[in-house]
């Protein structure tokens, strides 16, 4: 198993806890990590990746790439801490809560969940809430 986490910003983030959350969500979905890289970055990198791979010329909260099928996950996820901070303010939640929600969201994409339709978004939101309650309670941080 290889899970590597990189923080390319100056913002402090709970790296060990984020790794535990990623492992926990994937494990609960019946998956294991084979080779996964999690990059917590700023808007510049997020925009570049979003433009290059999805042809969207703007930064986004998360971009997730799954490179294989099956139970052993190989992939990458990129999370913009700038967008996480903006969304935390917009939704009136803490930066940490939003960071965990977006990390869980990314892990769910790795597990095969989509969010293109209203129904899929609602299902993912329910799963995010469930995993936030499981792994991200204040006493477990």
From Swiss-Prot:
**Disulphides:** none
| Pfam families given in the database record | YbeY
InterPro entries per the record?
MetalPrtase_cat_dom_sf_prd (IPR023091), YbeY (IPR002036), YbeY_CS (IPR020549)
UniProt GO cellular component terms: cytoplasm
Record keyword Amino-acid biosynthesis present = no
Tell me where it resides.
Cytoplasm
A single GO molecular-function term is: RNA endonuclease activity
Sites where the protein binds Zn(2+): 105, 109, 115
Q: Which Gene3D superfamilies match?
A: Metalloproteases ('zincins'), catalytic domain
Q: Which UniProt keywords apply?
A: Cytoplasm, Endonuclease, Hydrolase, Metal-binding, Nuclease, Ribosome biogenesis, rRNA processing, Zinc
Q: What class of enzyme is it?
A: hydrolase
Q: Which GO terms describe its biological process?
A: rRNA processing
Coarsely, its chief localization is: cytoplasm
Q: What is its EC number?
A: 3.1.-.-
Q: How is the cofactor bound?
A: Binds 1 zinc ion.
Q: Report the protein's function.
A: Single strand-specific metallo-endoribonuclease involved in late-stage 70S ribosome quality control and in maturation of the 3' terminus of the 16S rRNA.
Which family does this protein fall into? Belongs to the endoribonuclease YbeY family.
Q: HAMAP family in the record, alphabetically?
A: Endoribonucl_YbeY
What name does this protein carry? Answer: Endoribonuclease YbeY
Q: Which gene encodes it?
A: ybeY
């Amino acid at each position: 198993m290889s899970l590597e986490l990189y923080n390319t910003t100056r913002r402090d983030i709970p790296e060990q806890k984020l790794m535990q959350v990623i492992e926990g969500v994937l494990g609960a979905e019946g998956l294991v990590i084979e080779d996964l890289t999690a990059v917590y970055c700023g808007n510049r990198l997020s925009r570049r990746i979003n433009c290059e791979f999805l042809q969207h010329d703007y930064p986004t909260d998360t971009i997730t790439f799954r490179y294989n099928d099956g139970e052993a996950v190989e992939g990458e996820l990129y999370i913009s801490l700038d967008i996480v901070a903006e969304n935390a303010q917009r939704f009136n939640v803490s930066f940490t809560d939003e960071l965990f929600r977006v990390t869980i969201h990314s892990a769910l994409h790795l597990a095969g969940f989509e969010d293109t339709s209203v129904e899929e978004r609602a299902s993912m939101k329910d799963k995010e809430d469930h995993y936030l309650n499981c792994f991200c309670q204040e006493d477990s941080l």
